[in-house]
Regions:
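Acidic/polar active-site rim loop that often engages polyanionic ligands
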Residues: 26-28, 79, 142-152
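Internal alpha-helical scaffold of NAD(P)-dependent oxidoreductase catalytic cores
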Residues: 130-131, 148-181
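Rossmann-like NAD(P)(H) cofactor-binding subdomain of soluble oxidoreductases
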Residues: 83, 88-148
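Conserved N-terminal Rossmann-fold NAD(P) cofactor-binding segment
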Residues: 29-81, 91-93, 97
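Structural signal for hydrophobic packing residues in well-ordered secondary-structure cores
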Residues: 47-55, 85, 106, 128, ...
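NAD(P)+-binding Rossmann beta1-loop-alpha1 motif at the extreme N-terminus of oxidoreductases
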Residues: 1-53, 105
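Amphipathic alpha-helical segments at domain termini/boundaries
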Residues: 25, 62-83, 164-173, 179-180
């Protein structure tokens, strides 16, 4: 399996910030997307605020923000990303449009995972290019502290991509729970 080094996080609210913090704690290159540049400052503050807990949990000495970039362009965010964690609001219309865009700009072998807690993956990914690589990756909150993530495949999700997602989540100290669709 190709190692996943570059993670794109789409949406920088509570869940998105949690994924960003967890990935930074595991030395991943993280590209974050949100349409509002004003949110960058509050995100950086949240990363710094939570870092003492993360430092203890993962035995990290320092916070390296060199691995972190914030974009207001989804195309820039997705460039060369190996894993995409989408964290937008729970809304079918919004997520379906977003997944169509992500599918169009992500590299063909990039894993696409939605943090959705109650929407059906097949419906979310209805307009996504290469839906065999798409699934739900719903975390427990706060993501940077609680290590559980539910992985839910869509009808077109391949076992190969599910296994890659599982290994990635394990590489960032998550305990994947494989849910049948």
């Amino acid at each position: 399996m190709t190692k996943i080094n570059k993670v794109a996080v789409i949406g920088t609210g509570v869940i998105g910030a949690g994924w960003i913090i967890r990935c930074l704690a595991h030395n991943k290159i993280v590209h974050a997307y949100d349409k509002d540049i004003k949110l960058k400052k509050s995100l950086i503050n949240e990363i710094k605020r939570t870092w003492p807990s993360v430092k203890k949990l993962f035995n990290k000495k320092t916070l390296n923000l060199k691995n972190f970039k914030y974009f207001t362009s989804i195309q820039q965010t997705l460039k060369d990303a190996d894993f995409i964690q989408e964290c937008a609001s729970e809304n079918y219309s919004l997520k379906t449009k977003l997944m169509s865009t992500i599918g169009r700009y992500a590299k063909p072998n990039a894993i696409i995972s939605s943090s959705s807690s109650g929407l059906l993956p097949t419906k979310i990914y209805a307009k996504c290019k290469n839906p065999e690589r798409a699934m739900i990756g719903h975390p427990f909150n706060p993501v940077y502290l609680l290590p559980a993530v539910e992985i839910v495949p869509g009808k077109k999700t391949s076992k190969k991509f599910l296994e890659k997602a599982k290994k990635f989540y394990e590489s960032i100290s998550m305990n994947p729970i494989m849910v049948k669709h």
